């Protein structure tokens, strides 16, 4: 399903602005030096856009068609293979592979968090980038909880957790983006 047509998705501009803001806030409060702040801010913008990579309208997919091709190919393959599963399990697997599925759960930021110790012996730039990715990703999930909901608890539940239902391009979306740009 394409939630954008229904007006239930935040825009990529809003996600990238909020991710950027989240990265800057974390950088400020952790006292990151200049290069690490840049890495964290860059990671947070990418992290803010990453969950929508499974959407045909994603900013990342539109700029890097090969990434979109790989993601959608994997989705189709999983959906095809799920055809051999019992109906209820098949429906759950298919709901996890569509937009606002697995990539909109807490599994992704948890996996990134688990990767932090692996890159712990680097010069700090990579770590700052990954922390930014986590911040941007979490900001994306929070925003999408305001616009249709997200299945945060996959694989335990595919139920969407929603706080309210702002519309794409609506006044709240635009106002929020303005606050993030100038906040």
What residues fall within each predicted segment?
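N-terminal membrane-targeting hydrophobic helices
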Residues: 2-183
């Amino acid at each position: 399903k394409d939630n954008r047509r229904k007006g239930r998705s935040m825009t990529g501009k809003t996600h990238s602005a909020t991710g950027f803001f989240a990265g800057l806030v974390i950088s400020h409060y952790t006292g990151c030096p200049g290069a690490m702040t840049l890495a964290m801010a860059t990671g947070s913008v990418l992290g803010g856009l990453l969950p929508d990579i499974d959407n045909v309208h994603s900013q990342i997919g539109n700029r890097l068609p090969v990434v979109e091709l790989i993601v959608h190919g994997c989705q189709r393959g999983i959906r095809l293979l799920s055809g051999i599963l019992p109906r209820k399990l098949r429906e759950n697997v298919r709901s996890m592979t569509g937009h606002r599925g697995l990539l909109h759960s807490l599994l992704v930021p948890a996996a990134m968090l688990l990767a932090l110790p692996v890159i712990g012996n680097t010069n700090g730039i990579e770590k700052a980038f990954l922390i930014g990715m986590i911040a941007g990703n979490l900001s994306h999930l929070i925003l999408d909880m305001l616009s249709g909901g997200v299945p945060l608890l996959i694989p335990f539940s595919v139920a969407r957790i929603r706080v309210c239902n702002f519309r794409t391009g609506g006044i709240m979306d635009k106002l929020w983006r303005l606050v993030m740009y100038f906040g």
